[in-house]
Structure formats: C-alpha cells, structure tokens
Amino acid sequence: MATVNTDATDKDISKFKVTFTLVVSGIECITGILGSGFITAIYGAEWARGKTLPTGDRIMLMLSFSRLSLQIWMMLENIFSLLFRIVYNQNSVYILFKVITVFLNHSNLWFAAWLKVFYCLRIANFNHPLFFLMKRKIIVLMPWLLRLSVLVSLSFSFPLSRDVFNVYVNSSIPIPSSNSTEKKYFSETNMVNLVFFYNMGIFVPLIMFILAATLLILSLKRHTLHMGSNATGSRDPSMKAHIGAIKATSYFLILYIFNAIALFLSMSNIFDTYSSWNILCKIIMAAYPAGHSVQLILGNPGLRRAWKRFQHQVLLYLKGQTL
C-alpha cells in the first residue's frame, strides 16, 4: 500500500504562523461568506416568494449556497487545526473534516463547471451539430445534471472515510532539558485510494470547465476581432464587455485550476501539517471561492445593482445609529 506519512508535535508551529494563517484565511473566508451569503439571499428570496428561477440563477443559487457552506467549514477546520489540535487530531474528527471538505469542494467544482458550460452554450457560437443539440437541451437537462453532481460528489467523497486517512498519537516524545513529554501526531494517507477517489471526483468537472472556458474565450475573442475589423473601436461598449468577459473567464479558469491542485496537495499530506506549503494550500483554497463570489457580483448587472442598494441601506442605517 502506497502511503504518505507526516508528523507534527504540539510545539512545532510558531505563533506567527498561527496568527498569519488565521488572519489571511479568515479575511478570505469572511469575504467569501459575505459574497456567497449575499448571492444566496438574493436568489433564495426570489425562490421563497414562489418565483421560478431561470436556469442560470438556479445554478448560481446552488453554487453560492454550497460555497457558503464550504467557507464556513473551512474556517472551522482552520480554527480547530491551529488552536484545538488535540481535538482535531482525533482520528474520527480528522476524517470528518477531510471527508466533508472534499465533498463540499467537489460539489463546488461541479456547480462551477455547469455554470461555465451553461454560459458557454448560451453565449458562444460554433457551427457544430453537437453544440446546437446541447444548446437546445441544456435548460431541460440542467436540473437533473445538478442533482447528479451532488450524488457523484457524495459517492466519491464518503469512501474516503475508510482506508485513506489515519492519525496516530504518540504521547511519549521526551522534551530536551525537561522531565515531561509532548504529543506527536502522525498522519498517514493511502495515496492509491486518495488519488483514485479524488481524481474520479474531480476529473470530469475539471475537463468540462477547462473545455467550456476555452471555447467561451475563443468565441468571445473571435467576435472581438470581428468587431475590431469593422472599425467599431476599442471604446465601443460591446467590445469592452467582450474584453471584460474574456478577462473574467481567464481569471476564473486560473483560480479553478489552482484550487483543484491545492485541494489535492492538502488532502494528500505531502507537506508537513504546519509547513509553509500546507498553509499556502489553505490560503489558495480559501481564495478561490471568495474571489469568484466577488467576481460573480461585480460581473452580474442584477447582483451589482442589488449590492449597491444593500450598501446604501447599510450606510443609511449606520448614519441613523450615529445621530
């Protein structure tokens, strides 16, 4: 059995690392919670009023709700792993955090991939029969595809609770110049099982997202070049919108890929538990959902207007409190 073992003692992490990780990842998580919570509140309120949400808004609601859950869970894991290590390194608690983290991340990756596929089919133009067929069927199929994504995420996440992660504790490590001992935690990861379940759960949405994002960028780029050849000028609002969409899609693609890599490295325990590389993975994993939630609000006219109204109401409330 191919395994990776890492170890950590109670005293091998400095206060600076604890503070830095909690502050940076905390800011990212809080930003993401506010962004995802805002999107969930907007679309959730419409759904609660009995309105039928368009397909794109339905995907956004599921994506933002799953991200809200993910960011709250990531914040909890960071707090427990850094401040309550005795509890966190109990085998059952450790496995619970890892399994739910993988499930929420897989769900997010699937929903983000479907959102990009949906926008690609709605916006891009390619003269291919398969593309036209998908364009016609996507609205009917999307609710079933979203449900299937949740089931797939479950089926490839919960098997990780068996024969993948194990934590051992050795309480008899002597401390130099002292008669006491300290606890040493050994984390063992079955890499064969992890690679299989992780890759099976992430491979399809990753390929879907990269393909949809690439096709969308190519289509927008082709249309932008066509507009430029017609001398519409770079100041034309349509061209600016296309260039902005290309930049936003490229930015999201980079975030998506980096998050997938960081998640795998974090789950595999390749790096020491409290090493700088492992902390970097935590920061990247927190930055992806936060960054994309902000991008979704800024890039969606309806959400942008709702956010400005929300800001205005908050300012009025604060002014009323100070009077």
Swiss-Prot record:
The keyword Glycoprotein applies. The chain crosses the membrane at residues 15-35, 59-79, 101-121, 141-162, 191-211, 248-268, 277-297. One of its GO terms (cellular component) is plasma membrane. Glycans are attached at residues 170, 179. Keywords: G-protein coupled receptor, Glycoprotein, Membrane, Receptor, Sensory transduction, Taste, Transducer, Transmembrane, Transmembrane helix. It holds the Pfam family TAS2R. Gustducin-coupled receptor implicated in the perception of bitter compounds in the oral cavity and the gastrointestinal tract. Signals through PLCB2 and the calcium-regulated cation channel TRPM5. InterPro entries: TAS2R (IPR007960). Several bitter taste receptors are expressed in a single taste receptor cell. Belongs to the G-protein coupled receptor T2R family. It comes from the Eukaryota. It is found in: Membrane. It is a multi-pass membrane protein. SUPFAM superfamilies: Family A G protein-coupled receptor-like. Residues 36-58, 122-140, 212-247, 298-323 are cytoplasmic. It comes from Pan paniscus (Pygmy chimpanzee). Its main location: membrane. GO terms for molecular function: bitter taste receptor activity; G protein-coupled receptor activity. PANTHER family: TASTE RECEPTOR TYPE 2, TASTE RECEPTOR TYPE 2 MEMBER 40. The keyword Transmembrane applies. This is Taste receptor type 2 member 40. Residues 1-14, 80-100, 163-190, 269-276 are extracellular.
